[in-house]
């Protein structure tokens, strides 16, 4: 019998619990308390050590002064008993030891002068002087020249009482200081984090109500700059939502018209095919089918344009080296297939730039389609690309159509905008909007002029300024050490001179620049 064994899976780990964290206000307040507490403790230790050393040093000085006074007075040699008894009226204990003869003592009530090893060493002449603390007394022992030894001690109880009071004072003052630091830290933190609270409230308000009102900015500190950045984000979000709403509204309006017409035609075709229904003439059937196909193509074009716009807005763009000459050639092939009655006069300089190949191809194709659409049968469309300087080239697409009225030029490249004369022509109203978006995204500029100023018809010319670098002639090898990728990356300089910096950037009533939010109504 064959047994099947299933591999045992390792036991699943329980998910880690989110550890509760303190709020920023509490963390700042605790940090302030900790810093103040550390400083208070260090200062308390320093004060305690300094005062303690000073008090004990003062006791040593007092004992030293008493011993020197007794020795200098000569009373220890003349009448040692009386001299020692005289110290009983002070606050010290005294003892005079004469080895082999006598010991004189005078002690305070309830106190006994302790004699230990250091004092015995002084008495035996092994040490000249000793100081030490024994119990609650400070002892000084001095060996005199006549062989006697003087021992003096003083009680440390008054000093210890002072030190105990000092400890309590430092403890109370330190505690009060930490408490004051906590309160002050809380107040400062609350005032300092008020802009953060406003930002939090604004973010929650946006999430709840989609209210994108800016937040008031106070001061010029880091939090004020953070608030300004947040307001900038709110403005960008508001503009994005406005563009999105406008795009949806315009797209719905533009889609409704061909869909309604398509639905009507399809219903008419279906009704004519029902049993017993009168048959439409063959010519009308052909026209209806042609209308349906044209409307489907119009819908496909509109959807494709919308996809291109949303693709750019979503940032789904891959940048790579792009040969603009090749882009223009491929676009011309497509336009020639649709308008084989148009003559294209082409003069293109080899040029390479780093960007979105699909977007650039769509922009060039839209310009050529636009020029071909407005050119009369047998007309000429000019396509030239000439180098202006080592890092810029100008692409010019010109036609000899009816031209654009000056009052409509500022509407060029607006989404879904179509002039009165253009509404009868095929198109979605998005082609030039895509051109504008692609050109600006690649650091370029665009302007519109009459092909023949004052002519009848004046025609229209689009001037597109693009960054990049020239390509070597065909058959010319790339210099050693420089790859094609290096050449392409050198063409990414986004710095583009203003229209007046080029020889063809004339400022006149017939020139509309993209930078001035112009638009072409076609």
Swiss-Prot record:
Transmembrane segments: 31-51, 168-188
Subcellular location per the Swiss-Prot or TrEMBL entry: Cell membrane
Domain HAMP: 190-242
Any Pfam family matching the protein: HATPase_c
Record's keyword terms, sorted: ATP-binding, Cell membrane, Hydrolase, Kinase, Magnesium, Manganese, Membrane, Nucleotide-binding, Phosphoprotein, Protein phosphatase, Stress response, Transferase, Transmembrane, Transmembrane helix, Two-component regulatory system, Virulence
Topology class, membrane: Multi-pass membrane protein
Ranges in the topological domain labelled Cytoplasmic: 1-30, 189-522
Record GO cellular component, one term: plasma membrane
A single GO molecular function term of this UniProt record: ATP binding
Region annotation Disordered: where it falls in the sequence: 467-522
Residues with the Phosphohistidine modification: 253
Main location: membrane
SUPFAM superfamilies according to UniProt: ATPase domain of HSP90 chaperone/DNA topoisomerase II/histidine kinase, HAMP domain-like, Homodimeric domain of signal transducing histidine kinase
Record EC number: 2.7.13.3, 3.1.3.-
PTM comment: Autophosphorylated.
Main function: Member of the two-component regulatory system MprB/MprA which contributes to maintaining a balance among several systems involved in stress resistance and is required for establishment and maintenance of persistent infection in the host. In response to environmental signals MprB acts both as a membrane-associated protein kinase that undergoes autophosphorylation and subsequently transfers the phosphate to MprA, and a protein phosphatase that dephosphorylates phospho-MprA.
Name listed for the protein in its UniProt record: Signal transduction histidine-protein kinase/phosphatase MprB
Species the sequence originates in: Mycolicibacterium paratuberculosis (strain ATCC BAA-968 / K-10)
Gene, per the UniProt record: mprB
